[in-house]
Design a protein with these regions (language model features):
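Small-residue-enriched hydrophobic alpha-helices in membranes
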Residues: 1-56, 63-179
Length: 179
């Protein structure tokens, strides 16, 4: 397990950060990335172990925790643990339509339980995914859970940059649809 000092520091920060509005958490993570890049490799390993323990300690993983894991994996881990870059496997959107549906459906469902509002948010972003000949469908809640989101994000990272850019734009439109 992580060192006592790091665990204590993390616990004290958690008490300060917990009351923050959900919308403030990702910008806070973004600010923390710069400081975390200055960790020594051994400290990064401790940080990763502590983060894993904190996320798993309540026996469930929520959407923010999944996103936090993905951010750390994508933006920090390569700096401390060199890995070969992922090889692009998807050059068109067609094979990624199910993954786009999962992602956009999950994002649409985050801010509302009202199906009409969820559908409106989904439709605000769907055209920006640029699936051309294939229409995107809003998925029911049970088809866009954390496991499905994780799998979709993993596959989407293997797409060419333009597809990623389009999906980012679509995601922003979905999230922004609730005002």
């Amino acid at each position: 397990r992580a060192g006592t000092s790091l665990a204590q520091q993390t616990a004290s920060l958690r008490r300060e950060v917990a009351p923050l509005a959900v919308r403030a958490r990702l910008p806070l993570v973004n600010l923390a990335l710069a400081a975390l890049r200055n960790l020594q490799p051994a400290d990064f390993q401790k940080f990763q172990a502590t983060l894993k323990w904190l996320i798993e300690s309540d026996g469930q993983i929520d959407l923010f925790e999944l996103v936090l894991q993905k951010i750390i994996q994508r933006h920090l881990k390569p700096q401390f643990i060199p890995a070969r870059p992922a090889v692009t496997q998807f050059y068109t959107m067609k094979p990624l339509v199910p993954d786009a549906e999962v992602l956009l459906s999950a994002l649409a469902r985050v801010s509302s339980a009202d199906e009409a509002e969820v559908a409106k948010a989904f439709q605000a972003g769907a055209p920006y995914a640029r699936t051309n000949e294939v229409a995107l469908n809003l998925l029911p809640q049970n088809q866009c859970g954390l496991q499905q989101i994780d799998a979709a994000l993993t596959r989407l990272t293997l797409a060419v940059p333009q597809i990623k850019k389009n999906l980012l734009e679509a995601s922003v439109r979905v999230v922004g649809a609730d005002g």
